[in-house]
Amino acid sequence: MNLILSAAAGYNWSQLEIFVKSLRKVYKEKVLLILNKPNIELIKKLKDFNIDFLDTKIIPSDSYQSRYQYYFDYLNNNKIYQKVLLTDSRDVFFQNDPFNFPYKKDLNFFLEDDYIKNSSVNIKWIKRTTGKLILEKIKGKKISCCGQVIGSYQNILDYCDMMRKNIIIYKYKPSIHSFLFNRKIKGWDQGIHNYLVYSDIFKNIDFYDNESGDVATLSLKKGLNFNNKGRLINANGNEYSIVHQYDHFIDSFKSLIYKISN
């Protein structure tokens, strides 16, 4: 049995509808969401689509970082899965079963269309967590997005273990301005993620870019290609199983989203 695991605390049904409906059109196995006090409508809809959830104390504003602890705890106590996908939810939809892609390695990461050195936000996330020396070492690498990670059960468990531990070790150090104005910095787990994936800590790993991979990571993508069915395809003409950050091209996906919703 495979598992799709996502932290979706703070979201309502309207924010998760596309994720859930598109997923259940292509995948029938276990899905688990990490939530915090879901409302009645969301609970009912998740039940209708056979989506399981854990009602936890996860804080929505901190869920980018704290989700790995919840992932680890659940996986460590449920050693029944073969493959696991960790995924974002609000800005994700599915075109095919993500476990059907012929991955050759046990842990797989997905690249954005630019380098760390060209992204001020990724530079900040790395420099203010792991520090300048790590940034200098990996800034020439392509940005690896932490919103999608797929692999074998044990390798995903090990990944979550390393993420939760290093998020504590390399806690984000805000600027004086952010500290004084109490600004919440989201997403800095990606700084830890890039440090880990480029530090030879994980074994038997692979990286996939938007050109040939099964996951479309769109925030930095310049243009989109669709097949005659209106589905997003990569440079090889293959449909992506997962489309992430589609809200960056929301007008291009209106007809596809309409089909999913109805």
Give the location of each predicted region.
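N-terminal anchoring/stem segment of glycosyltransferases
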Residues: M1-Q82, Q154
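Membrane-proximal basic amphipathic "stem/tether" segments
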Residues: M1, T129-G131, I250-N262
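Short catalytic/ligand-binding loop motif for oxyanion handling, primarily in non-cytosolic enzymes
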Residues: S14, E41-I43, V92-N96, F101-Y103, ...
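A structural signal for short, well-ordered beta-strand segments and their strand-loop junctions
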Residues: L32-I34, K83-D88, F93-F94, N108-F110, ...
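GT-A fold catalytic core of metal-dependent nucleotide-sugar glycosyltransferases
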Residues: Y70-V121, L157
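Short, flexible, basic/aromatic active-site loop/helix in glycosyltransferases
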Residues: K124-G140
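Catalytic core and acceptor-binding pocket of nucleotide-sugar-dependent glycosyltransferases
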Residues: I138-F253
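Short, charged, surface-exposed secondary-structure boundary motifs
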Residues: S61-S66, K117-I123, S252-F253
